[in-house]
């Protein structure tokens, strides 16, 4: 069985322009505060109350991800949500190449890496 791959900020930075789907699962208020990593897609998973419309989210996800083995990098604030979501995608939906940004966007910013606001 596949498992979630932890990627450091430097590893993620090297993937920015590759054929990798990067999905930021944070909320809009979080995007506004920190920005997002270049070329990542905003796809909020949990709302402020911890709720998620899973069918709608999965529909958007499946439009971005072309195959079950395509590399997907999930991003959140501190890598807590992304581990949960990655496990869900691997165990319940058969994805085999799911990674997440170790330490989340907080770690990315702590290392002085850039984000974009859009």
Task: Please state what every model-predicted region is.
Residues 1-20, 28-71, 80-118:
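Rhodanese-like catalytic fold shared by cysteine-dependent sulfurtransferases
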Residues 74-76:
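Short, surface-exposed ligand- or partner-binding patches at beta-edge/loop junctions that are enriched
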């Amino acid at each position: 069985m596949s498992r979630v791959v932890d990627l450091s900020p430097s590893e993620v930075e090297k993937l920015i322009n590759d054929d990798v789907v990067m999905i930021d699962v944070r909320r809009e208020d979080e995007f506004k505060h920190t920005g997002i990593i270049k070329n990542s897609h905003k796809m909020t998973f949990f709302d402020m109350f911890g709720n998620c419309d899973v069918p709608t989210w999965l529909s958007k996800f499946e439009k971005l991800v072309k195959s079950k083995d395509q590399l997907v990098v999930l991003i959140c604030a501190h890598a807590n949500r992304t581990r949960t979501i990655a496990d869900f995608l691997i165990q319940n939906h058969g994805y085999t190449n799911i990674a997440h940004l170790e330490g989340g966007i907080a770690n990315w910013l702590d290392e002085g890496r850039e984000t974009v606001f859009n």
